């Protein structure tokens, strides 16, 4: 099948009147941060080529990338992909994931929704995540880990760890290469650091108690800050 992907500025070209052959699949994209930019109209849904989606849970590029941790909020993935399916985006789903391990849970959620959306809907995203944690770490540890994971996703939804100092990789003025350009007060920054430190301590405690074959799984699938990763 042939596919047309109106990514970034190409969507503006499409909206300006670009004609795409009817048999070509239209693959709609998110904004690189989890929000789909265009849902097909009735006319686009009736096309022979059908509709697909190209969705990010990891992104390299401007204005800010996020590659370090798997911080894409599962509830946002669930909401956007459910809406995509309901709006007729059903032929092809592609996930931009970058490093697979940090986003292993988001990948599983995305693929399970692509395979059987109704089953995931009936289960609910929280129960789906719970099943993942129980399978990988056992019931008792899942009881302790799920609140940690949910709080980490909540914090990252407000502002991802990679965005705390921004990604001015080509900035010539050195004063902008540090956190001084973050529009938060000192109190907000300290509260954020304390919240992540608390999460990190909880994850590290579980990590030390895990059998060797499960340590890497927790290390890479928990959206935890850097100091926990030093414990290796």
Language-model features: where?
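Short, solvent-exposed, charged loop/turn and helix-capping segments
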Residues: 206-219
């Amino acid at each position: 099948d042939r596919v047309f992907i109106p990514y970034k500025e190409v969507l503006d070209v499409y909206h300006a009147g670009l004609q795409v052959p009817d048999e070509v699949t239209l693959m709609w994209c998110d904004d690189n941060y989890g929000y789909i930019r265009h849902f097909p109209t009735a006319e686009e849904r009736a096309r022979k080529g059908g509709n697909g989606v190209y969705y990010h849970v990891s992104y390299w590029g401007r204005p800010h990338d996020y590659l370090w941790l798997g911080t894409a909020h599962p509830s946002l993935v669930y909401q956007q992909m459910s809406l995509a399916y309901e709006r007729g985006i059903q032929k092809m789903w592609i996930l931009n994931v970058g490093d697979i391990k940090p986003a292993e849970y988001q990948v599983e959620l995305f693929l399970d929704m692509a395979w059987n959306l109704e089953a995931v809907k009936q289960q609910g995203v929280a129960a789906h995540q719970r099943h993942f944690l129980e399978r990988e770490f056992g019931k008792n540890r899942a009881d302790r880990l799920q609140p940690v994971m949910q709080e980490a996703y909540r914090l990252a939804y407000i502002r991802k760890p990679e965005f705390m100092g921004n990604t001015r990789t080509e900035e010539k003025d050195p004063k902008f290469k540090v956190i001084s350009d973050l529009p938060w007060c000192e109190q907000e920054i300290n509260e954020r650091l304390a919240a992540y430190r608390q999460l990190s301590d909880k994850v590290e405690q579980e990590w030390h108690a895990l059998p060797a074959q499960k340590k890497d799984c927790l290390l890479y699938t928990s959206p935890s800050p850097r100091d926990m990763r030093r414990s290796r």
